[in-house]
Amino acid sequence: MKFLLKKALFISAISLAPAAFAVDMTGAGATFPYPIYAKWAEAFKAKTGSNLNYQSIGSSGGIKQIKAKTVDFGASDNPVKFDELEADGMVQFPAIIGGVVPVINVDGVKPGEIKLDGPTLADIFQGVISDWGDKRIAIMNPGVKIPSGPITVVVRAEGSGTTAIFTDYLAKTSTLFKDGVGAGANVKWPAASTVGGKGNEGVAANVTRVKNSVGYVEYAYAKKNKMTYINLKNKDGNFVAPDDLTFAAAAAGTDWSKIPGMGTFITNASGAKSWPITGASFILLYKNPENKANAAEVIKFFDFAFKDGKKMAEELDYVPMPDATTDFIRKNVFTKVMTK
């Protein structure tokens, strides 16, 4: 992990708008949505001249920074509970939907060739299954040549919303995992051979580097790095591959407007084509922000993303929020933020 350093990712582009109207916004948090936030920010800069400096430091870091009021908005894949939002004077809304995928580095195995269910995947990540030659893996993959070798588990080194989504799924499908490891942004991984990586990019780098390893990353990182992913058995009993269609299928049954604070996990969702480790990434804003001009620009940024950023999201295999949800956000969340 020595080469993985805490970094601030500065997003900029050539300004096509008058400098007098430009605003320098700041945000921090989840690495899960960083690829699409970068694309949206570039397009928003070209249209308005306003910059976004987004620190991709992990969901726990984003929550800490917004609570410390050092950024204009926080970003987290691990939704903040409604009571906590109320106590802190904040609002929360989902900005984008994506999928977390298990990725591996096993010689001779192609993407999607290995199929697993939730309990088996959970046993791998808690060290109950420690070799790729384990008969439980073989039984689920008849005809697939999987070479034996000790499994190295790659996890997030810091508090992470991606970890929260992933462990929420594992805990829902494995009682052993739920009771032994539990779900959360930062858990104690019991597997003897465990390696940490900073951010989704750090996990992707370590899985790529370490032979016979397995990790979990947001799908855009797996796709960008041409990683080998595992197909999973969903709640309906079907093996599915990760992509924007299976993520959308998983999210289809969620009525965000009826959830206090709009915060929920959508893992292990019903549906024939649902990807079981699907999640949303959330934005946190103060109702009465110290810098109201910047808060107004943040709202304009996400309104722009909702209206003009759908194609950009789909190109990276994210799922844009449905129109009904973004309309609800405009009327019931944005209006609670004081911008003057």
Regions found by a protein language model. Give the residues of each.
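Bacterial N-terminal signal peptides that target proteins for export
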Residues: 1-10
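Alpha-helical transmembrane segments
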Residues: 10, 15-16
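Flexible loop/hinge segments at secondary-structure junctions
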Residues: 22-340
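Sec/Tat signal peptide C-region and signal peptidase I cleavage site
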Residues: 16-22
